[in-house]
Amino acid sequence: MYFEIYKDAKGEYRWRLKAANHEIIAQGEGYTSKQNCQHAVDLLKSTTAATPVKEV
């Protein structure tokens, strides 16, 4: 798996998580700066298997 950061048609930075076969698994909202988008990716990368899942 790997993350991609890209600029969309509206000029916002977005991230997407892709599987080894290059299919999109997850994607995030648009950010006005590349730094904020990278921060979101870094937060996701810091999660662990112990991170809880909550049903709402």
Swiss-Prot record:
It holds the Pfam family DUF1508. It comes from the Bacteria. Belongs to the UPF0339 family. This is UPF0339 protein NMB1088.
